[in-house]
Curated annotation (Swiss-Prot):
Tissue specificity field: Specifically expressed in small intestine (jejunum and ileum). Probably expressed by Paneth cells at the base of intestinal crypts. Coexpressed with MMP7 in small intestine.
GO cellular component, one term: extracellular space
Region (Disordered): 23-43
Subcellular locations according to the entry: Secreted
Membrane-spanning ranges: none
Biased composition (Acidic residues): 23-41
Protein name, UniProt field: Defensin alpha-like protein 1
Propeptide regions on this chain: 20-56
Organism listed in the record: Rattus norvegicus
Assembly and interaction partners: Antiparallel homodimer; disulfide-linked.
GO terms, biological process: antibacterial humoral response; antimicrobial humoral immune response mediated by antimicrobial peptide; cellular response to lipopolysaccharide; defense response to Gram-negative bacterium; defense response to Gram-positive bacterium; disruption of plasma membrane integrity in another organism; innate immune response in mucosa
Role of this protein: Intestinal defense peptide. Has potent antibacterial activity against Gram-negative bacteria E.coli O157:H7, S.typhimurium DT104, and K.pneumoniae; and against Gram-positive bacteria S.aureus, methicillin-resistant S.aureus and L.monocytogenes. Remains active in the presence of NaCl and Mg(2+). Probably functions by disrupting bacterial membrane integrity. However, does not show cytotoxic activity towards human intestinal cells.
Signal peptide region: 1-19
Domain of life: Eukaryota
Amino acid sequence: MKTLILLSALVLLALQVQADPIQEAEEETKTEEQPADEDQDVSVSFEGPEASAVQDLRVRRTLQCSCRRVCRNTCSCIRLSRSTYAS
């Protein structure tokens, strides 16, 4: 009788040990399915005078002045060349 109780206790213990990893795996999948705040993209747009200032900064970064010593990083030569091509 004692042997039967001991064996049944071991079987129940083994079943409980096997059930714990399954519950932990289910909890991990639940936390993985929730979207994180880090994954969201944010776009910012400007209207009015601020937009033109931001666009001017982008243009200045992409265009490089070929005569930096003459215009001393004011890029007046680039502005002149753009207005020449525009007309």
